[in-house]
Design a protein with these regions (language model features):
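Glycine- and aromatic-rich loop/turn segments at beta-sheet edges
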Residues: 1-16, 53-74, 112-133, 164-181
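Periodic glycine anchor positions in long extracellular repeat architectures
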Residues: 21-24, 79-82, 134-137, 187-190
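Terminal, non-catalytic domain-edge segments
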Residues: 31, 86-102, 110, 114, ...
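Short acidic alpha-helical/loop segments enriched in Asp/Glu that coordinate divalent cations
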Residues: 40-44, 61-64, 93-107, 129-132
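An internal, amphipathic alpha-helical element
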Residues: 76-78, 84, 124-148
Length: 212
């Protein structure tokens, strides 16, 4: 902890994301802070939270600064889906009760509900069905939200996406590596996992580290 340097972190990944960026760092430290109270955790959490917010341009859009032009996306790995799944985990564990971020539990739930509605309105659909980059990650969010809050997901939206996925051949287009590889995050293993999770209440979310 004494050697932690935020400038080095900024140079390495100046973007908000659960898998690779500030959101993942914040979530890890919130877990650590719950187990071992340490002011140094709180300091880094607050700094990372500020930096994540500085990348937010509008509702559910965080700029990815790895490229000069900067862009936002809705992927799990480095976009809004992963960020909001992490926040769903925060809500479940009531992490905001442990630290003052200027963000209340009520505001968090409102954002989580609004993101659910954004997904179900089809505003952030893609032509990809992988867990890392596609629509099935969005469905994973809806499943987790329903199981945590009891607020039902829109089955018409789910049916629409599943029907479209079948027509599109469960395409993992534009994912790194081969289209429709057998991999979990960008391939057919992950697609089958999501279908199984939708049909079985006892399967937890891989995308939320099996915490939802």
């Amino acid at each position: 902890m004494e050697n932690f340097n935020m400038k080095i972190m900024d140079a390495s990944f100046a973007f908000a994301s659960f898998a690779h960026g500030y959101t993942g760092l914040i979530t890890s430290l919130l877990c650590m802070n719950r187990v071992v109270k340490d002011d140094r955790f709180s300091i880094i959490i607050k700094k990372a939270w500020e930096k994540e917010n500085n990348l937010k341009t509008s509702d559910f859009n965080w700029i990815d600064k790895r490229s000069e032009e900067g862009r936002s996306c809705h992927y799990w790995c480095h976009g809004s889906c992963g960020i909001m799944l992490a926040r769903l985990f925060w809500y479940k564990e009531e992490f905001l009760m442990d630290i003052e971020l200027g963000y209340t539990e009520e505001e968090l739930l409102s954002d989580l509900r609004e993101y659910k509605e954004t997904i179900e309105a089809g505003k952030i659909d893609t032509n990809n069905y992988s867990l890392s980059h596609g629509n099935f990650a969005l469905i994973d969010y809806l499943i987790s939200f329903e199981r945590l809050t009891g607020e039902r997901m829109n089955k018409k939206y789910i049916d629409k996406i599943f029907d479209k996925a079948r027509v599109d051949g469960y395409s993992c287009y534009d994912s790194p590596g081969a289209i429709n590889s057998i991999g979990h995050m960008v391939g057919e293993t992950g697609i089958k996992y999501l279908i199984n999770r939708y049909e079985n209440n006892n399967i937890k979310s891989i995308l939320a580290c099996e915490n939802l």
